[in-house]
Swiss-Prot record:
It comes from the Viruses. Residues 70-146, 234-269 are annotated as: Disordered. Residues 37-66 form a coiled coil. One of its GO terms (cellular component) is membrane. It is found in: Membrane. Signal peptide: none annotated. Its main location: membrane. It is a single-pass membrane protein. This is Uncharacterized protein 056R.
Length: 283
């Protein structure tokens, strides 16, 4: 069986039996596991570094948003402050509010809120959104960390918009002669070591007939049995005995004439050599 795989989507992996390979642009998914190419290493490192920075900022925010700090913030206006007089000036109100509100940490900007609040709260700019009353608003969409739920979010890479998705392994069909085709990708029976790929396959049948080109996209184990799906090695030997006067051209199948007295002396290794020679001449 001759394999003709698209060079743009050809990858070499240690593939086991019943494994499905999906080529998604520059991402290869084998058995539901994503393998990234070299061109995406820098982008992944950048995203990881930004996520680590966001985690560090959120950790620092949570340290200042502990329940103990909230109790101090809620108890400070009632114990230390008094209701302002109607005749108080704006400067006195501002000085009183600055005395009640805690000082912001250095990583949050280090300035007090400009507008009055019903009770002291916390403001932050780490996610690009101001928050009051200790509640965080939703961050910008570009700052949302990548998870399994929002993994379909499109992004730009290599000047192309791609969508990533988690793929499940495609189980092969249990029947011997039929194939399981889904979305233009076909797989063979389970007992063979099969790999599905996006390419074309030329299927050669050895005997006193011409090779046939398969229109389906599939690949099987490179052994003698998938090359002769409906006949065994013995039946091929019998067909060679019955057609001892016929010769095969080197471009079609096996070159040379076989005599009936030498057929029983062909070993399995010799048959494999003849098959390999026919495949090389076909290329």
């Amino acid at each position: 069986m001759e394999q003709k795989i698209d060079k743009k989507n050809s990858y070499s992996f240690g593939i086991t039996s019943s494994t499905t390979v999906h080529v998604l642009g520059e991402v290869v998914a084998i058995g539901g596991i994503l393998y990234y190419t070299h061109s995406q290493v820098n982008q992944l490192n950048t995203k990881i570094a930004s996520l680590e920075k966001q985690i560090l900022d959120l950790t620092n925010i949570l340290k200042h948003l502990s329940p103990h700090s909230f109790q101090q913030l809620q108890s400070s206006p009632t114990t230390q402050s008094t209701p302002p007089l109607p005749q108080s000036t704006p400067q006195s109100q501002q000085s009183q509010q600055s005395a009640v509100l805690p000082q912001r940490p250095s990583f949050l900007g280090g300035s007090t809120p400009k507008e009055s609040q019903s009770f002291p709260g916390v403001e932050t700019r780490s996610l690009g959104e101001k928050t009051t009353r200790g509640k965080l608003k939703s961050p910008h969409p570009s700052q949302i960390p990548v998870t399994q739920e929002n993994f379909h979010y499109p992004y730009q890479t290599m000047n192309k918009t791609m969508r990533w998705e988690f793929l499940k392994p495609v189980e092969s069909d249990e029947s011997e002669d039929e194939t399981n085709c889904q979305n233009g990708v076909c797989t063979l029976q389970k007992q063979e070591k099969n790999v599905t790929f996006n390419g074309s396959v030329e299927q050669l049948k050895y005997g006193n007939f011409s090779p046939q080109r398969s229109t389906k996209t599939m690949i099987g184990s490179p052994s003698i049995r998938p090359l002769i799906p409906h006949e065994s090695i013995e039946s091929v030997s019998e067909s060679i005995e019955s057609s001892q006067d016929q010769s095969f051209s080197s471009r079609e199948t096996i070159s040379g004439n076989f005599k009936s007295k030498d057929d029983h002396q062909l070993s399995e290794s010799e048959i494999n050599q003849l098959v390999s020679k026919a495949i090389r001449t076909k290329k």
